[in-house]
Each structure stands twice: as C-alpha cells, then as structure tokens.
Amino acid sequence: LSEEIQERFYKGYHTVKLPHKFKIAVGGCPNNCVKPDLNDLGIIGQRIPELDEDECNGCKKCGVVQVCPMGAAKLEDGVLEIDKDVCNNCGRCVGACHFDALEATYGYKIYIGGRWGKKTAHGRALSKVFTDKEEALNVIE
C-alpha cells in the first residue's frame, strides 16, 4: 500500500502546494511503531479474525486464547469468542487454531488529523476498517 500511496500522491500530486509538510505513516501492525495517529494521515494494517464456529472444537488449551496479546479471545461454553471491542486486529490468533477455525480478512485502519512537535495532537481513527484497498486509497485522496 505504501508504494501505491507514493506513486499516486507524491508523484501524482507533486505540483500541488500544501500549507505545510504533509506527513504520512504506514504501519503493518497495530503496535504503533510508526505513530500513525501522530501524522497528518496514518494507516495501520489490520488482520480481522473471523471465526467459523462449526470448526471450533472448544479445546481446553485453546491456541488462540494463549496467543492473544489483548485478552480478547476467551472460551465461553466450550466455544471460542473474540471480543471485537478489545481485539486490536493484530492477527496473531490467525493460524493458532489447530483446526483452522479462524481466518483473517485484511484491511486498513485510517487515522486523520494527527500532529507532532511542540503541540502534539492524536489523529482520529475513521469509524470503518477498510477491507478494499482501492476504497482506502479513494478515502485517502
């Protein structure tokens, strides 16, 4: 995605004058390494887990529960449940199930309006995780 942003916006819009240096950060995971929320535009890669309950065997030592760094995965009544409000879509759980009950949808979380320097401001995350790359690029534009 970062190469497409470079091609489309840096090269495509290089003649457009902006009021200040426009900063873009693209990160591959939700660990905030590149501080996407502190840039004018920030993008974080997402791996949204999707559970197939028919494939879940409710293992007592569930690999998904063990690897979730957020504690979003729990066994409830013998079935895995993922709390979407707690999950940060890091994707570590994908592939941890021995019965392939979890798959991932890839997406992009977009932040706008961040600023760093003397007066920092955290950008706002758009309310939607974009699963279509072209839609994400159009929103960025």
Please name every model-derived segment.
Residues 114-140:
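A hydrophobic, small-residue-rich beta->alpha segment in the mid-to-C-terminal subdomain
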Residues 87, 91:
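Cysteine-rich micro-motifs
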Residues 50-54, 80-83, 107-113:
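Short, well-ordered strand-loop elements centered on a beta-strand within folded domains, enriched
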